Each structure stands twice: as structure tokens, then as C-alpha cells.
UniProtKB/Swiss-Prot annotation:
Protein name listed in UniProt: Probable 2-(5''-triphosphoribosyl)-3'-dephosphocoenzyme-A synthase
GO molecular function: ATP binding; triphosphoribosyl-dephospho-CoA synthase activity
InterPro entries: CitG, TriPribosyl-deP-CoA_syn
HAMAP family according to UniProt: MdcB
Function noted in UniProt: Involved in the formation of 2-(5''-phosphoribosyl)-3'-dephosphocoenzyme-A, the prosthetic group of the acyl-carrier protein of the malonate decarboxylase.
Family indicated by similarity: Belongs to the CitG/MdcB family.
Amino acid sequence: MHALNLQPKTITLAERLADLAVDALIDEADLSPKPALVDRRGNGAHTDLHLGLMHASALALWPAFKEMAEAALEFGEIGLPLREAIGRIGREGEQAMLATTHGVNTHRGAIWALGLLVTAAALDTKSTSAGAVTLRAARLALLDDRYAPRPLSHGAQVAQRYGARGAREEAQLGFPSVVQRGLPQLKRSRAAGHGEQNARLDALLAIMTDLADTCVLYRAGEQGLHAMQHGARAVLDAGGSASLTGRRRLHELDQQLIALNASPGGAADLLAASLLLDRIERDGILQGAF
């Protein structure tokens, strides 16, 4: 009788980064209670989304994230060839997402944000702090993909109308909502002993306090954005999601945003980006990949 071989299979760096990106998307989807977003309780302000669809969409994006990391390793430097390669891969990933979800846009913004971060992380595994990775991602985002389709997304239309910073500008600036809001709040809440789920909720709320979320602007206009930002600040000012008063404020915010049809999908994408960077930075997870 042969002993079972329990040695874990060695995975490549690209595979590991793709795993982390998918994990971040699933962790974001599972996090509950999120205001007006799909979570374990229900569909939030959405009629076309549910948790199982979010999971399936995230898993469908694994090949695209892996190929982006492989492209970074192949090209080895920030430049137009790499930018256009990951742009093509991202568009292919979007088609895989839409095939899985039967045409529902679950993660278009996340493909952009997490794809850039996966690529940036793969470019230099010896420099994986959040600041270093987001700086490389910003340099990539600033390059113009000549093959990108030009029709304006909903987010881009709203960004033009309201003068808001869209997903492209967020990346080109080095993800300030992540580096200055999400990650610091995640670390503060952990240090205060609030527990991982509450720390992640607080990180989402911190992003929401300042983000001109184009998903909210598209669905609910400036009234919805004001409600999101001020409501998120009220939760944090009340002690965050780990406090009784903060939980009450969070419930109130959830109900208010649902009534306004204001779902902060941009903030959710940036929370997923925060969770990805946190895992890369905190656990040194890239060290064991080959």
C-alpha cells in the first residue's frame, strides 16, 4: 500500500497571483453586511446580480489574471507592448465574464483594477509593498492602448458629466482611494482588535467616504453620492462596524442606498484591490511561487 503523496503542488508566480486576485473578488462578494451591494444576505440594490453569479464571474476571470501576470514576466518592463498585451487579455477576460453571466456586467471595473495590480506585482517580486505595486500600476495605466475600443463606458460618461474621477484616473493616480483610505483603515481596525470582517467593512466604508463612485452617480446622481459619502462617514464616526451604534448606522445606510438605487460598485472594486494588495504585502505570498 502506497502512502498518499500530500506534498502541495508547486504553482507558478502567475498562477499564484491569479489565485489571489480571484480570492480578493470572492472575499469582497462574501463580505456582509455591505450597504446596497450583493452579499450573503441578498442582492442589495441590484435586480440582475446574486452571490452565486459574483462567485462564478470571479472564477471565470482566473485565466485572464494569470495571462496578465505571464505577460508581465515575458515583457519584463513597463511599456506600450505590455500595456497593449494586458489590454487585449482584459478584453478577452471581459468576454469570458459576460459568457459566464449571460451578459451581466459583474466585474468590468475589477478586471481593470486588479489586472493592473496583478501585472504590476509580477513585474518585480522583490518590491511588493502597496506603494511600489500601485506606482508601477499607475505607470502602466498612463499608457494609451491603441487597440482599446473608444465607446464611453457608463463610468466614463458619468465622470465627464459630473467631473468625477473615474476608474481610469483612479489607476493613473496610483489608486489613492486604496493607498490613502482602504488599506490604512483596514490596518487601523485590525490593530484595534475589531476582527477581520469588521476591518474589511471599515475599509470599504473608508473608501466610500471620499470616492466619487461613478456607479452611484450613474444610478442615483449626486443625491446618491452625497448619501453614500456622508452615511459611510457616520458609520466610522460612530465607532465603525464593530460597534453597536456603528452597526445601526450601517443598517440605516444600507436601507437608504437601496431606496435610492445607489450601489457603490466602484468602492467594492477598490476594496477588492485593497484586499489583493494587503495579501501580497502582508503575507509575502509571492516568495513561495516558482
